[in-house]
């Protein structure tokens, strides 16, 4: 009986010492040491982690009110950078990536609540930069455990810049083209699910500029239009445009 009482007293003393050593501040009033913060009005932990003179250091774990882990952040470089992962309330991984100076950086992966890929994105200074891939919602009946690519695109400082492709769920190409600083540029082509060309459109600074051609499922040209700065030219307007274009070329060749 005496040994049981000693054990209880020892455990209670250890608990008091532990309780007294958390949620402390330094002489400047900044959080320092281990901290455990609870959801307001509850006994459920909201987050726990360690501070060093007001700066998060090492692993922090955040929780939903149901007690499931919401996020994990592992801080380094004096709290400026971190590796982060977020979770659904069913425990499945939601996203994972890196922060540099508290902004998204490098490759981030996003998943749905069943663990299937949603997107894979590249970041720099908090903005999309580089290759980004979106995936179709996972369908276990048809996807055979493999994610199906919806779009592949490239960004520069948050703006679409470079190649772009969009795919049918069967993996065949649906659309392809190029962007320049957020605007469509040059030839954009769409395809039928069979792989045959459907449309061919030319762009300049994000608007139609040049021929727009439509094809049927057999690859035969059905309509052909011509645009300048987003406006369609027809009849006499179109004839005059090509006449002026021809004269400009002749003048340029004579000037050389």
Residue ranges and their predicted role:
Residues 1-23:
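Bacterial Sec-dependent N-terminal signal peptides
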Residues 17-256:
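Glycine/tyrosine- and acidic-biased, solvent-exposed loop/turn segments at the edges of beta-strands
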